[in-house]
């Protein structure tokens, strides 16, 4: 991921196609916002070329640029990895989604667990939600995650944080690991110790996030409010990232 943006710019200049220009501009804009510690106003546009788009662009630029087009498409598809390595974030929060969470779920206070560098916490705070960010900070020893938080992070394991900060309206967990059972332990702690009416997870069903057991349980809520929130949070890449709410009466 070294010189990621530089490689993008070079390939963009060589390919010289408006569809490619647009995606490179989108990536640069996201990088500008995140790099300056600011949340995006709305979810980013879709990145990467679908097979038919790839073929259409290739016809216009010539087959001699196929290698370059393949390379830049690979960079588009690896943008999330770039963000994780440079800024320690896997999920791109945005103000529109945060405002909908506040309004539709009637949230005034929130606790983010496994917060990493707390980009989601920062965004929730931006729309007026009093937010506490917590993380065990174990991975901060070996990665960028947590190295430069966007919001103050308290060193606390998830279940301990839920027990300590029990009087919040919302618990949020973004990109819980797809190994171990920390997500199940967090839900168990919520049931035992917390007064929070809402618990949401951000991730990919049966994919990049959460334990297999998490997805096998029949505890997901399906509400009009959640549908509206998710309509503002379409994924920007091939990962089907969405917001899931756990039923507190399962």
Task: Show the residue positions of the predicted features.
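Conserved class I S-adenosyl-L-methionine
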Residues: 106-116
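Conserved acidic residues
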Residues: 108, 169-170, 197
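Conserved SAM-binding loop of SAM-dependent methyltransferases across substrates and taxa
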Residues: 117-129
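S-adenosyl-L-methionine
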Residues: 134-170
């Amino acid at each position: 991921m070294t010189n990621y943006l530089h490689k993008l710019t070079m390939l963009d200049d060589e390919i010289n196609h408006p569809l490619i220009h647009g995606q490179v501009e989108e990536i640069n804009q996201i990088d500008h916002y995140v790099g300056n510690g600011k949340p995006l106003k709305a979810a980013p546009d879709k990145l990467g070329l679908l097979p038919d788009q790839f073929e259409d662009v290739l016809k216009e630029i010539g087959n001699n640029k196929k290698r370059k087009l393949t390379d830049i498409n690979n960079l588009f598809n690896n943008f999330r990895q770039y963000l994780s390595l440079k800024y320690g974030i896997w999920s791109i929060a945005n103000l529109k989604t945060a405002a909908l969470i506040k309004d539709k779920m009637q949230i005034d206070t929130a606790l983010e667990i496994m917060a990493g560098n707390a980009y989601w916490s920062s965004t929730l705070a931006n729309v007026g939600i009093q937010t506490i960010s917590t993380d065990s900070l174990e991975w901060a020893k070996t990665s960028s995650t947590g190295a430069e938080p966007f919001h103050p992070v308290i060193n606390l394991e998830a279940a301990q944080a839920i027990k300590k900060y029990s009087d919040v309206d919302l618990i949020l967990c973004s990109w819980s690991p797809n190994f171990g059972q920390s997500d199940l332990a967090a839900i168990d702690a919520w049931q035992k110790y917390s007064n929070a009416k809402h618990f949401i997870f951000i991730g990919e069903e049966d994919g990049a996030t959460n334990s297999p057991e998490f997805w096998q349980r029949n505890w997901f809520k399906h509400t009009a409010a959640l549908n509206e929130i998710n309509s503002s949070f379409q994924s920007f890449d091939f990962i089907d990232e969405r917001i899931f709410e756990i039923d507190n009466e399962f």
